A protein has these predicted regions:
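N-terminal ordered "arm"
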Residues: 1-50
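Short, flexible beta-strand-to-coil junctions
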Residues: 13-19, 63-66, 190
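Structured domain cores in non-transmembrane regions
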Residues: 35-116
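Surface-exposed polar/charged interaction patches
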Residues: 47, 90-97, 108, 122-129, ...
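Extracytoplasmic/secretory-pathway segments with low complexity and glycosylation-like composition
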Residues: 103, 109-149
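Acidic, low-complexity, intrinsically disordered interaction modules
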Residues: 136-183, 190
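Non-Sec secretion/translocation targeting segments of pathogen effectors
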Residues: 165, 214-239
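Long, highly charged low-complexity segments enriched in Glu/Asp and Lys/Arg with interspersed Ser/Thr
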Residues: 171-217
Length: 239
């Protein structure tokens, strides 16, 4: 089963209504589409006018649901919906094994990850970590290295294998590798050279992942139309 499976959600709230003492919002399942997001905005009153004729233009996020350990604690009230959607889509597009790897890395605690930009970059850097399924404690790790990793052979160990303190051996290995144990198995860093493909700029999010307005729409909105009136000529619009 996919890790998210429709369970990455954000409660998008009308900020203007909230400041008036009303909680008007809706749970949004991520990833979603720009069309669906616009429907949500309409339902929660974004774009509509208040009693003074001023439009409700701002929103914020009052709650999250995410099945991946630690993710909710890294997300704030004013996160970009485009970034959130990009993150959810990137996770959904991972293979099932890579999704499980991501879960294990987050459960182990990833020093490189502290915010949504880091989470996005983590999806591009899963090969920087090794996951060893079925190894859940120091004793498992010590036994694996002694018998299965090829460091020692059963023949070489002989009866000495009965006297090995696998737990202590595994503890020393985990300390040397800075590895951690999770429900998914043992997690260790394979490479410290992260490739930061996403620098946090919204312009770097591909249009297909944007849900608050595509790049083309933003470009159209930024165009200024000027009515030019010249003596003896018909007025005309210049962009």
């Amino acid at each position: 089963m996919p890790v998210l499976d429709g369970n990455f959600e954000a409660f998008v709230t009308n900020l203007g209504k909230y400041n008036e003492g009303m909680l008007v919002g809706e749970w949004v399942k991520l990833p979603t589409t720009e069309e669906e997001m616009q429907k949500v905005f309409e339902r929660i009153g974004i774009g509509k006018q208040d009693e003074f004729g001023q439009p409700y233009e701002e929103w914020f996020i009052t709650d999250y649901e995410c099945p991946i350990y630690g993710v909710q604690n890294m997300l704030g009230e004013y996160e970009s919906l485009d970034k959130l959607n990009y993150l959810a889509a990137l996770i959904d597009e991972l293979s099932l094994s890579d999704q499980e790897k991501l879960v294990a890395i987050m459960e182990a605690g990833c020093d490189e990850v502290s915010d949504i930009d880091d989470l996005i970059n983590l999806t591009f850097n899963l090969d920087c970590y090794d996951i060893m399924p079925g190894i859940n404690d120091e004793s498992d790790l010590g036994y694996y290295y002694a018998h299965e990793a090829g460091i020692y052979s059963e023949k070489d160990l002989g009866p000495l294998a009965n006297y090995i303190d696998y737990e202590r051996y595994g503890r020393d290995i985990a300390m040397d590798e800075q590895g951690r144990f999770t429900d998914e198995g043992y997690v260790r860093v394979a490479s410290e050279r992260w490739d930061r493909q996403f620098d946090g700029e919204l312009d770097d999010i591909p249009d297909e992942y944007r849900i608050t307005g595509s790049g083309e729409a933003a470009e159209r909105d930024s165009t200024i139309a000027v009515l030019v009136v010249e003596p003896g000529k018909e007025p005309y619009v210049k962009e």
